[in-house]
């Protein structure tokens, strides 16, 4: 559960991410594909090379979903219901991949926002991304 302080940290950090969300997520996806090659199996039709337009487009989709989630911190299940259905029933993504992408996104955010990325902010963002992952995998059961 996100505390009020966590919510403040997440909103403040995401507001600083701003228009860079899609770029940061695309970078995190590239990092994930490189660091965890098994994640590539869900994207057989993508060019996964550095700077790929397909990875950037997917980064934009994920960035928009995270921005929507930040706007609905008190009701993530409703805000992410359609995405949860998609990932559980159509795409059938292994739930561990959400954790891997979350980790790569934290690394990416810390590299772009080193001053703002305090231990407290790190913990808040980690909790937020964990909650998003939990919601996205909730319909797997």
From Swiss-Prot:
GO CC annotation, single: hemoglobin complex
CDD domains: Hb-alpha-like
Organs and tissues of expression: Red blood cells.
Residue list for modification N6-acetyllysine: 16
Taxonomic superkingdom: Eukaryota
Molecular-function GO term, any one: metal ion binding
Residues reported to bind heme b: 87
Residue numbers carrying Phosphotyrosine: 24
Quaternary structure, from the entry: Heterotetramer of two alpha chains and two beta chains.
Protein name: Hemoglobin subunit alpha
Protein's organism: Loxodonta africana
Lineage: Eukaryota, Metazoa, Chordata, Craniata, Vertebrata
